[in-house]
Amino acid sequence: MKLKTIGVTVCLLLCSLVSLAQVWQYVDPRIGSEGVGRTFPGPSMPFGMCKPGPDCTVKPNAGWAPMPEVVTGFSQTHVSGTGGGQKYGNILIQPILWSEECGVRSEMTQTRLNEDFSLGYYATTFENGIRTEITASERCAFYRIHYPHSSLYTPHSSNSLLIDATHYLGKNPLPDLREQQQFVGAEVEVVNDHEVRGFSRVRGGWNNGDAYTVYFCLMSDKAFIQKGANTFVFNDTLLNIKVGISYVSTQQAKRNIPDCDFDTQLNKVRETWEQQLCKFQIKGTEKDKRMFYTALYHTLIMPVDKSGENPKWRETPYYDDYYAIWDTYRSSSPLITLLDEKREAEIVNSLLNIYKREGYMPDARSGDCNGRTQGGSNAEVVIADAFVKGVGRGARSEECGVRIDYDYALEAMLKDAEVDPGADHEKHGRGGLNEYLTYGYIPYGIDRAGTRTIEYAYNDYCIAEVAKGLGRTDVYERYLKQSENWKNLWRADYEWDDVKGYIMPRDAEGRWLDSVPWGKSKVFHPQIPYTPVTKVAPWYLPWWSTFFYEALSAEYSLSIPHDVPGLIAACGGEETFRKRLDMFFERKRYNVGNEPSFLTPCLYHWIGRPDLTSDRVRQIISDNYTDQPDGLPGNDDSGAMSSWLAFHMLGLYPNAGQSYYLLHAPLIPEWTLKLCNGNTLKGVLKGKGTHFEKVTFNGQELKDARIEHADLMQGGELAFYVSAARKAKAGEAFPRWEQSIPTLGINEEP
């Protein structure tokens, strides 16, 4: 008997150790859910289409909010980390205690007493004793609802479930408000005493999209009796229901319901996430692990895999909810490439399928409709990033099992760069393209002229990269030259805040503008001085109508990722550039909460000071990121803020659209990554202190603190050396290769 007890104890201990080794347990869905992060805290599969969770009011983009404590119900579709107008929040269900005296809807809105969050799981207990647990598959929500034992069915009261197909986020009594969703139609049909099906059709939302339809099929393990049009009563205290969703039909929604129970699906969602997250193994504090693995998790929630669920065409793969590429191309897409190269290849092919069917690739897309473009046509950066890293090319396409037709991709990129979308410029393409091609910049007065000019130049550089690799020398030379157009808005003699040279507004006649109109009043025409920290619009005009989008000239003037050597020269050389960077950070011009400044801390690399990059990054993370619910400094934007954090915790950061990573001292003392080709990459911090000295790869010092993606994919060890005292100078200046174009031979595979 004692031996049997010992055996059981050892078995339980081993199971406990295995459980502790699972990294999914470090994911905290609450991180970023409060404050400005706006992350979705409910259950989701990687890139999952179904994201069920509570809608506390119709205002939060992710549905959930810490306050007020009421819950309107649980809807099946949400986005994560987004700003602007709401999207989705379709097919709401709400467990209620129905009574003949009070009526059905009197207790529709419930008050939360407590909540439980973990990866793949959400639960809450209402004030009336109802407890709801939720998990999800890719296209189906699972609910386990516990009613109080004292509330069994009587002729006058019952345990009930309300289904509201008219619900959506962003409801507003005023019709046709910009960025607001509007109801189009809905239907609820009772098939039998275990099955309900129907649809919800809504239009608008953040991207001002066409109407989309969410079909559903609800299956219950207990028979119900219908009470009214959309309320169903049960003579039981435990109810298991599944809500399959589809964008094609109710029949497809039913087929999307897995044949398993709640606990089985909960284990499956966690196993699926574990397969993705455990590719990284890290050593560090518990806080480090929570922050890092949650950042990876946020990066893999969107875009959404809707392959086979597009009502407009059948080509696969198909991904939706690019929300938005302007946010995600800098760090989210490169991180997905490292974690799941096959997935990134599918995402690129999805962009090309959208181009094939709709004429343009999106810069943003939701509800099966392109829109809204924010700055450039940044699908070009995503494609170039995949191209220079060999994704879907040659032997690498065989390794990941997906091939990308880059000749066709170049065609799609050139469509963006050469064909003005006209009135559809907020949906896709390049607004102001004719002016850009005529003047070499976009004149003031056209929305987001400064942002568009800078980003179009960057996009042109990405076109040049792909064209060179494909042997299209004529296209390469033209777009390489065009990538210098940022210089046409560089006002070299403008001095402000002890710094000379800024990206500044210019009119169609080529005149620099020292003052600009304030607002768009047709009666008054006030002018205000324009400076590098001026937001050229009053409160009632959004970022869409300003010279720069979501940042100011002081920030955008350092955002030339494809030509940092040219930027340094324009600023007056390396020493002047360093002083400018120092003042930029010390005077609080840097804004980690918006994407245009993502690369800025790494600009010290180009003047041979990766140690200063390391210092800035460490301070930025310390000041702005935590493992708390308000632990993100800005809208997570489909994993943008989170992927920025994850990369820097590892000690590397991509320059999107280019083939290398910039290296600095990691925050994690040791990590390993299982690469998609089977090789293993290891990072280890050596020495004591915080001052970055040097980095080696497989024992060889990397003089410029940078590593090529192709070298990284061979696997090996990155050793980051730190010390307590700073050296006079760390590393060396970046080599001045030709415009940073990768040295690909004609049609040469990387």
Indicate where each model-derived feature is located:
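Bacterial N-terminal signal peptides that target proteins for export
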Residues: 1-10
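ATP-dependent phospho-/nucleotidyl transfer catalytic cores
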Residues: 459
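Accessory carbohydrate-recognition regions in carbohydrate-active enzymes
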Residues: 22-149, 158-333, 337-381, 387-392, ...
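N-terminal signal peptide c-region/cleavage motif recognized by signal peptidases
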Residues: 15-18
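Surface-exposed interfaces of beta-sheet-rich extracellular modules
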Residues: 686-699
